[in-house]
Swiss-Prot record:
Species of the source: Streptomyces venezuelae
Biological classification of the source: Bacteria, Bacillati, Actinomycetota, Actinomycetes, Kitasatosporales
Required cofactor(s): heme
Pathway(s) it belongs to: Antibiotic biosynthesis
Biological function: Catalyzes the hydroxylation of narbomycin to give rise to pikromycin, and of 10-deoxymethymycin (YC-17) to give rise to methymycin and neomethymycin during macrolide antibiotic biosynthesis. In addition, produces low amounts of neopicromycin, novapikromycin and novamethymycin. Requires the participation of a ferredoxin and a ferredoxin reductase for the transfer of electrons from NADPH to the monooxygenase.
Protein name, UniProt field: Cytochrome P450 monooxygenase PikC
Top-level EC class: oxidoreductase
Amino acid sequence: MRRTQQGTTASPPVLDLGALGQDFAADPYPTYARLRAEGPAHRVRTPEGDEVWLVVGYDRARAVLADPRFSKDWRNSTTPLTEAEAALNHNMLESDPPRHTRLRKLVAREFTMRRVELLRPRVQEIVDGLVDAMLAAPDGRADLMESLAWPLPITVISELLGVPEPDRAAFRVWTDAFVFPDDPAQAQTAMAEMSGYLSRLIDSKRGQDGEDLLSALVRTSDEDGSRLTSEELLGMAHILLVAGHETTVNLIANGMYALLSHPDQLAALRADMTLLDGAVEEMLRYEGPVESATYRFPVEPVDLDGTVIPAGDTVLVVLADAHRTPERFPDPHRFDIRRDTAGHLAFGHGIHFCIGAPLARLEARIAVRALLERCPDLALDVSPGELVWYPNPMIRGLKALPIRWRRGREAGRRTG
């Protein structure tokens, strides 16, 4: 998506992140650290060609995430949305209060820790089936993205929302096209196709007694449009599906990459699985699935330590750098599953804190436990330097994660 600002006055120099290539995609942390040393806010050009502001450093990141002067509503942006984007942006993630409050309240109860815990048996069943299929590979090798990291969260969120099984593969194509775009036109086409599909899915649920979340939202909209308009219904379906799986895909894959790249930490976790919850939190901090929080737009000029961000400009808060700020996380480049990660921002901060965090954590914990318990000597099947990272400044994700394990009597046994 093009996010070049319109109508701003003289701007500071622009750092072209795209020119840094795969080196930056694979390891953006030194660049972010250099920027942080120079100040909290910087103009950059993303690999897509968008000119935006990056906010770096833990304290500034946390403050901006909770600052009401930074709007999430595109009506406060100087950059117009395309028709395809506008059709899908009527959702809680891209709204400010009171609209945000109203929309979030409609779905919040479905994602409480108590409600999510009720999904544990089904999530375990899905994980067991996927790991069974993966371990059936005759050569003891697989791409973890394809075998587990992607199919688990798309299955869980699709069942929760009532997306038919035959339709789910299309979401991989659509989300890859606009989350990791190679071609802007292709991204717009994907958004239009997803919008059309979701509109048809919503229509198919009208007048039915479905027990899924999307059916419940359809009934709410039909009964009282003041609580949920038809445009908001479409936007909510979109954000729940995309945010409901994309983050968890990369949490599982990035987390397992971090674990497999640090044999001492892998051994420590295998020896004491009570460390699992803390390990997942360290995965979120060390190599989290969200590199930068989604777009924000100042409603007035905002001065960050002497750098003024004009009203309407696009701002990305770099969570990845917040988590590598040594004043907040000592020795931040060390992966340590016993670390105190309290205060990490992987799921955001403030009113837009990720509503699906309990579900993402549940899926990741079950997936990691299953892999370690059922694959005796799970390992990367390539060197870390051979892995390819997507050049997206918001989503931190791998194109593939090749793994291998020992074939033998011990491999593959379910322990639960």
